[in-house]
């Protein structure tokens, strides 16, 4: 059964890390385009869907929840004097005044590959960790089956703090249910 489990998870991740025996049963899967663990989710898992949000009176805006939420002030706070260069090199401004990664940098993996190719550019090496961080400025991850999973510690993101209090409270309740009720039932039944 464990070989089957590992083979199945190879569809979603290049590598799996098992910290302890519980990790063998509750596998944390990081999609191939991501590098950081906060952009992973349990496999198997009971994903969220749009109705889970609507039932809690949360307007489901997939782009707002699943794409990095990057404002001009966040870029200036992170990059200080280099903010202008970073905006021009890595981002495009969208119709809402927010910043989206350019297509060639729209995943952590693409960003890392670019920086590794630019070995002589000290400036790029210095900003890599901040750019990777910006990729994690999300509330939800979308899986290959169009289900949604909360980003770990979403409450610590600028994206979350930018929401109104009612939405934050509702998301917190759903987050707690997702991690501590919904998944436990699945693992209890399939453990």
Q: What are the functions of these language-model segments?
A:
Residues 1-191:
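Catalytic cores of glycan-processing enzymes that make or break glycosidic bonds
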């Amino acid at each position: 059964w464990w070989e089957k489990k590992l083979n199945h998870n190879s569809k979603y991740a290049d590598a799996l890390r098992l910290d302890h025996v519980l990790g063998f049963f509750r596998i944390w899967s990081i999609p191939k385009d991501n590098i950081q663990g906060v952009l992973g989710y349990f496999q198997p898992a009971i994903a969220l869907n749009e109705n889970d949000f609507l039932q809690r009176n949360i307007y489901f805006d997939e782009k707002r929840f699943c794409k990095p939420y990057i404002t001009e002030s966040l870029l200036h706070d992170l990059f200080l004097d280099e903010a202008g260069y970073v905006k021009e090199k890595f981002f495009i401004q969208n119709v809402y005044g927010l910043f989206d990664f350019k297509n060639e940098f729209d995943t952590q993996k693409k960003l890392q590959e670019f920086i590794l190719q630019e070995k002589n550019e000290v400036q790029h090496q210095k900003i890599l960790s901040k750019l990777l961080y910006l990729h994690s400025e999300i509330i939800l991850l979308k899986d290959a089956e169009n289900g949604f999973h909360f980003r770990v510690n979403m409450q610590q993101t600028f994206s979350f703090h930018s929401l109104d209090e009612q939405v934050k409270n509702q998301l917190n309740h759903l987050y707690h249910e997702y991690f501590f009720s919904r998944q436990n039932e699945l693992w209890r039944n399939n453990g």
